[in-house]
Amino acid sequence: MKTAKKYNPDLILHGNLIRAILSLAIPVVINSFLQTMYNLTDTYWLGKIGTEQLAAINLVTPMQNIITNFGSGITVAGAVLIAQYIGAGEKEEARSMANQIFICAMGFAVVCAALCFLGTPAIVNWLGADGGTAYYARVYLRVVIWDMPFLYMVNIFSAVHQAQGDTVRPMFLNLGGITLNLFLDPFFMIILDMGTAGAALATLLAKAVPATVAFILLCRPENDICLNRRYMQLQREKLGMILKVGLPTAIGGSTMQLGFLLMSKNVFVYGTEAMAAYGIGNKVNGLITLPSNAIGSATATIVGQNMGAKQPERAEQGYRFSMWISVVFLFIGGMILSRDMISTAIVSIFSKDAEVVGMAADFLSVMALWCFTNGVYNTTSGLFQGTGHTEVTMAIDVTRLWVFRFLTLWFCESILHMGVRSVWYSVVISNGISSLILYVLYRCGIWKKTRIKVGKKAA
């Protein structure tokens, strides 16, 4: 394909599977790392300014993620459906689907950003913030929420290229954004002394630039899959497919993020320092699990194309390779990160407050020890996404947080009286249980049942 000249088009469907997994996953790891650096850069500079500013961002970030994850269901559906069309040899349908994804995602982003902007005071009040934390949270959210259309544009670009087996171009696109953000953060926050408003503005501008580039590249007619007026009218059949695959992902992701928001409220009960520690621990732990997330994403592409090509045995083999690579990596990385000396040294980069550092290091040590379960969770989720069974991942996403995590939190707080450590253990226990359930569902063979039919050949 013209948009993926660097890659052997037969690698995913007929080549070495381990090579296919790594060729897809490594650029996604780098890309995800760059995305995480957006938030870590803000965290680093805000940690230099004050604990209230840091706590404010940690408090409102889950709310922003709720909306972002709901819209991401559209682009996840796009990646799955485009990949299956490509596997089935239906390039014209793949082009049409890419344009339908663009219309849906961008429309959703603009409407939600406007509503969230208007509702910012109510959102911050509901979160229970007061004083300086509430003020900084309102300032940050009102600015950063407008990055949604730009973020979705980049996600559309990534979905289109990932479905074709090209994860390198999205990586370079985000590299430009993070490089820009590294300069803009200290400029707005320190030199211009804009604090949280500066952090939000820097992030907004750093996403606007790559989004503009993404739009220009997707409009190039020489690409096999591009944006074109010819396909810009909503098609009921394809809209139905997007909703069938994307809505469960959207509901699961946003419901899960709402749970994270309520978790933040539970942490905030223990004070501003605990809130800051919780945010730091989550972000650092997110770095160690990036390869697992990337391999899960690669699994969805490999499974999607092979299921479209009617090769379920190869799809399953790709999943198994992916899972073991992910689990082994996370087990080794987790063992290293769980050492107190290492975890303390890492979190000290983001805060000089001794109490914050102590709690964040403790949180990180507990999570790192059990992060290998994420390897099972992410790759098995990728399997179900690639086959279009997003209703399974939705159900597990929701129960992981709203059932297992909150029940564990209640038990540790009310029965065992573990204090803030109740939060730490509720995270690892709920992740472990959910990973086990997902694997059992895989063994039951649910993923083999046809959920979506793509292309003219399936009509």
Cite the ranges covered by each PLM segment.
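N-terminal transmembrane alpha-helices
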Residues: 12-44, 48-49, 62-77, 81, ...
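Transmembrane helical elements of multi-pass membrane transporters/channels
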Residues: 23-42, 143, 154, 177, ...
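Helix-terminus/linker motif at the lipid-water interface of multi-pass membrane proteins
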Residues: 33, 37-55, 124-131, 187-196, ...
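Small-residue hotspots at the loop-to-helix junctions and early N-terminal turns
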Residues: 51-62, 137, 141, 200, ...
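Small-residue-rich hydrophobic transmembrane alpha-helices
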Residues: 54-114, 151-170, 277-339, 374-397
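Hydrophobic transmembrane alpha-helices of multi-pass small-molecule transporters
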Residues: 66-69, 181-185, 211-215, 287-290, ...
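Short runs within selected transmembrane alpha-helices of multi-pass transporters and secretion channels
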Residues: 75, 143-162, 170-178, 199-212, ...
